[in-house]
Amino acid sequence: QIEAVRALGSAGAADDLRAPSEIYRASASKATRGAVLEAFMIADDEKAILEVARTESDRELRGKAIQLLGALDSTAALAELYKSESSREVKVKILEGMMIAGEKEQLLAAARNEPDRELRGKAIELLGAVGADAELVELYRVTQDRELRGKIIQGLMIAGNGKAMIGLLRQETDPELKKQILQHLSMMDDEEAMNEIERLLTEKP
């Protein structure tokens, strides 16, 4: 049955997709429901996946639906879902879906404006995964919170931008943040970063 459901997704006809929708509603099998979600993705049926992301009670299936929305670059649907969602766990999945879709703007909005500190920090880390280096540097400059600045440093390491981190290191006056930047630089395979660390170690006090 699972392979048959996936085949219907490949066919992609609206009439055919009614069958997987009915299977999803009727089935108690997580594997079968997962196959139906894959059929929806193969058929580019954003509406059906969004409905699952909104209403599914099984956390794993709901997370998979959100991930598939990201794979379909359904950024508007993810943004809408984020605004209406109250669960932190689900919101993390939505942010990860935005990362899969390469959606910088929505992640940046969450990094700037999300009142939940944990979610804000997650959005900052994911900005590094989508290569939003310039946005992270600017965010660092306007953010005074030490913990969030630490998340930005981590985001820049994820982005592999040692040069930007060196720039922040040279401007930073907080000893704890300077230490964090140095620790992250030491984990990077970056010649310029290694040279900067060596310079600081040999520099006279």
Residue spans for each PLM region:
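Amphipathic alpha-helical scaffolding segments comprising HEAT/armadillo-like alpha-solenoid repeats
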Residues: 2, 13-25, 43-55, 72-84, ...
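Mature soluble domains of exported/periplasmic/lumenal proteins and thiol-rich metal-chelating peptides
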Residues: 59, 108, 117, 125-128, ...
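Ankyrin-repeat and related helical/solenoid repeat scaffolds used for protein-protein interactions
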Residues: 150-188
